[in-house]
UniProtKB/Swiss-Prot annotation:
Domain UPAR/Ly6 positions: 21-95
Membrane topology field: Lipid-anchor; GPI-anchor
Assembly: Interacts with CHRNA4.
Name used for this protein in its record: Prostate stem cell antigen
UniProt gene name: Psca
GO-annotated cellular components: membrane; plasma membrane; side of membrane
Chain positions listed as propeptide in the UniProt record: 96-123
Leader peptide range in chain numbering: 1-20
Organism whose genome encodes this protein: Mus musculus
Amino acid sequence: MKTVFFLLLATYLALHPGAALQCYSCTAQMNNRDCLNVQNCSLDQHSCFTSRIRAIGLVTVISKGCSSQCEDDSENYYLGKKNITCCYSDLCNVNGAHTLKPPTTLGLLTVLCSLLLWGSSRL
């Protein structure tokens, strides 16, 4: 009985895909419409990234994909700017915008509600 159980378990694990992250992926594209290829990330890649390099305010080059160690970054250069954004859910790098994590969103909503209540009580 144990043998059958382990055989079924091994078959299930072999056939069942892991819960890998999916990110949009492209290299050196001029706009987001050209960055709609979906990439299945490896299990050690826990974030999606979008890299935008804007040169002289005229040309923007976009790259997207999976990353194992992503850090938001922004650097200004003499002739342009580089901006890297990271996110952590399936297909979250659709346009490179930051997505607020739930604790951040909850904190902002709490502050906003407090300000609204405080302001209405002073009227």
